[in-house]
């Protein structure tokens, strides 16, 4: 147990075995042996490791069996493997603490997540996603106006939302997964607000549309369309832009961005789609 925890904490900290060894005052070989479970650190070394990794001693003894499944990433192809592992380790740590609190409090944070019953069993074209997005809003009693706080909305519906810092450019937006059968959405805490909102809506699309998309529909394209439709429903796009436009003024898009929390580029895509 300690070995797995040590490796996870080291990965979150972004340290190599040698770097951690220097901070904790032990050899890199000792760190490797601890992580492989070949030897156990003494109490003094464990305290030094906790200090170097900025975690509490209890972290190394936390018992939590976590299974992350059906992961859907929004990342760039050139994202370093080391950074990806760091994100996953941080996410696992946060989810474990979330689930641990549920166990301690002996009560769930919210009602279990459930996809709206009226969603279509099979989506055969992207235009169906316009109505699907409205169905979700209506089922969740959100109306069709701008949604101020998506994170609150998602958490109230049983989705665990995790923010993780990643400032190495824009190589990572987020991902969705199932953690012990609970839906999880992870977003980049360093991204701009409108980008975070789109990622949240996009990943909601993955959670809802998985196994519903017909043959020939690309899941990423479908989730992008759903995200735009969820953030700004079709009736309000037509109301704001009209049924036919050949030009969009930047100032107009800027005002709509601030009202709806959808980027100017996102509004351009909404206009093109409709």
What function would you assign to each model-found segment?
Residues 1-274:
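Short juxta-domain linker segments that transition from a proline/glycine-rich
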């Amino acid at each position: 147990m300690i070995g797995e925890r040590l490796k996870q904490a080291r990965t979150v900290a972004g340290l190599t075995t040698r770097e951690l060894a220097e901070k904790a005052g032990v050899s890199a070989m000792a760190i490797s042996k601890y992580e492989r479970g070949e030897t156990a650190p003494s109490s003094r070394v464990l305290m030094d490791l906790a200090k170097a990794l900025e975690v509490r001693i209890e972290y190394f003894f936390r018992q939590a069996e976590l299974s992350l499944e059906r992961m859907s990433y929004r990342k760039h192809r050139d994202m370093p493997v080391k950074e990806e592992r760091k994100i996953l380790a941080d996410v696992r740590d946060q989810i474990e603490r979330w689930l641990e609190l549920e166990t301690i409090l002996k009560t769930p944070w919210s009602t279990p997540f459930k996809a709206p019953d009226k969603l279509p069993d099979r989506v055969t074209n992207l235009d169906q996603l316009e109505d699907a997005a409205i169905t979700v809003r209506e089922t969740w009693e959100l109306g069709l106006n701008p949604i101020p706080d998506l994170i609150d909305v998602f958490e109230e519906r049983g989705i665990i939302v995790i923010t993780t810092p990643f400032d190495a450019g824009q190589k990572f937006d987020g991902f969705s997964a199932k953690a012990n059968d609970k839906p999880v959405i992870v977003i980049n805490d360093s991204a701009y607000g409108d980008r975070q909102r789109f990622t949240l809506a996009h990943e909601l699309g993955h959670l809802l549309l998985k196994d519903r998309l017909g043959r020939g529909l690309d899941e990423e394209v479908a989730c992008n369309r759903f995200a735009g439709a969820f953030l700004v429903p079709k009736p309000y796009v037509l109301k704001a832009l009209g049924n036919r436009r050949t030009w969009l003024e930047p100032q107009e898009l800027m005002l709509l961005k601030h009202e709806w929390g959808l980027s100017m580029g996102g509004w351009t895509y909404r206009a093109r789609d409709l």
